[in-house]
């Protein structure tokens, strides 16, 4: 099946419209807000292998700021965005972040979705410049390590859980599904390497056998050589750590070369594009793991509103977490003593205070939140993914979702709590 060109046709038209919409954020009713704006930088993967993720995330950011502006704006101003496409490439992302920080003087950047894009932005630009960065999708454990080492200057946060735990969840899920001997093909970047390492430690500790582990480089027209290497020994299934476009190519090669049609998939493969690219009939034994949610009133509201607003699936990877990232940023700007990075960072904890008044998503809830903030009261943002609480390194905790592909659709079949995962890791002496 021919791969879709991510920078041609209707998809590119959507991206152009998206960029325009993000700059022209809706105006609130406040006359003062109509006179001033506060710009938030956004660097997302609108094209390239993760283009579907980035587009879904960008629309969610736009929706969150629409709701905040409709609620009266922050600090008497509208929030607008300066949005740039990283093209799913680290070098492009670094250049974009540099422009936003050095020329745009933005106090905060939302992005990226991929760890391989997010980490270079952090280490080369936002960390040294002490500009706040919040990612809705970068799950590499390396980001926690950078925080511990002081290399983030305390300016990095994310609304997704670390793969340090997801790898362990995937290992147990694979064994529970009868994959005792597994081949692994994983993307050769920070995300893929870190997730594989965490998976391998737990999987082997539980008695599983990794018959082959093969890295691949992105955006190749064929992965026949990688698949051949992965099939060097008999396996019960394939753990494929990839993105929908490359993952489709690899899975098709695996199937055509006679590999067992049993798959374990990472969170980014929770995608209709992947299912369509491979063919649902070949994926009846495809299982996956993702960061889960703790459903709140906000969850149901988002699913309804996002579909109408974005004309996209609210289950798209990064959409829910991007809305929460943007909402938290906007509320923190409102609560900050000034619209500067350090002040906004401090205010992140004011708007996610476990002792604060609970606030859900949407115009009415944000209006209530802004009134409380003006009166010096803390709030507890309970977003689309549930209550959000950051630790000293900008990490959050949350459950993990277990899913499978059934009749061409992703279906949730279970969950592992953080306590269950930690107990597993402790049992293995890690």
Language-model segments: what does each one mean?
Residues 14-26:
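Bacterial N-terminal signal peptides
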Residues 2-17:
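Bacterial N-terminal signal peptides that target proteins for export
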Residues 2, 18-19, 30-430:
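Extracytosolic ligand-binding ectodomains
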């Amino acid at each position: 099946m021919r791969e879709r060109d991510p920078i041609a046709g209707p998809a590119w038209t959507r991206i152009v419209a998206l960029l325009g919409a993000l700059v022209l954020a809706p105006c609130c009713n406040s006359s003062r807000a109509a006179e001033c704006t506060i710009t938030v930088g956004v660097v997302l993967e609108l094209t390239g292998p993760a283009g579907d993720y980035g587009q879904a995330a960008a629309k969610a950011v736009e929706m969150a700021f629409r709701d905040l502006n409709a609620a009266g704006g922050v600090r008497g101003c509208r929030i607008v965005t300066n949005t740039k496409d990283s093209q799913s490439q680290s070098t492009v992302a670094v250049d974009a972040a540099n422009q936003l920080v050095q020329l745009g003087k933005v106090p905060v950047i939302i992005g990226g979705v991929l760890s391989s894009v997010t980490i270079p932005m952090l280490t080369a630009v936002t960390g040294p410049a002490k500009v706040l960065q919040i990612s809705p999708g970068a799950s590499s454990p390396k980001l926690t390590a950078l925080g511990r080492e002081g290399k983030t200057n305390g300016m990095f946060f994310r609304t997704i859980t670390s793969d340090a735990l997801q790898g362990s969840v995937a290992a147990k899920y694979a064994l529970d599904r009868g994959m005792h001997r597994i081949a692994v093909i994983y993307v050769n970047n920070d995300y893929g390497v870190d997730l594989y390492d965490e998976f391998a430690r737990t999987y082997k500790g539980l008695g599983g056998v990794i018959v082959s582990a093969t890295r691949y480089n992105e955006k190749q027209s064929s992965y026949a050589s990688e698949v051949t290497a992965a099939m060097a020994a008999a396996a019960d299934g394939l753990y494929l750590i990839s993105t929908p476009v490359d993952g489709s190519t690899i899975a098709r090669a695996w199937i055509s070369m006679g590999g067992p049609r049993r798959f374990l998939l990472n969170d980014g493969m929770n995608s209709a594009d992947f299912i369509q690219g491979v063919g649902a009939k070949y994926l009846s034994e495809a299982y996956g793991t993702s960061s889960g949610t703790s459903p709140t009133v906000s969850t149901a509201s988002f699913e309804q509103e996002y579909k109408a607003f974005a004309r996209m699936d609210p289950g798209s990877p990064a959409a829910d977490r991007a809305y929460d990232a943007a909402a938290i940023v906007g509320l923190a700007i409102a609560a900050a003593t000034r619209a500067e990075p350090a002040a906004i960072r401090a205010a992140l904890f004011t708007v996610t205070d476990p002792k604060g008044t609970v606030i859900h998503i949407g115009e009415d809830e944000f209006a209530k939140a802004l009134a409380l903030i003006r009166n010096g009261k803390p709030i507890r943002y309970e977003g689309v993914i549930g209550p959000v609480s950051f630790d000293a390194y900008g990490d959050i905790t949350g459950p993990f979702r277990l899913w499978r592909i059934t009749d061409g659709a992703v279906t949730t079949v279970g969950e592992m709590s953080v306590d269950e995962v930690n107990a597993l890791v402790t049992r293995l002496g890690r």
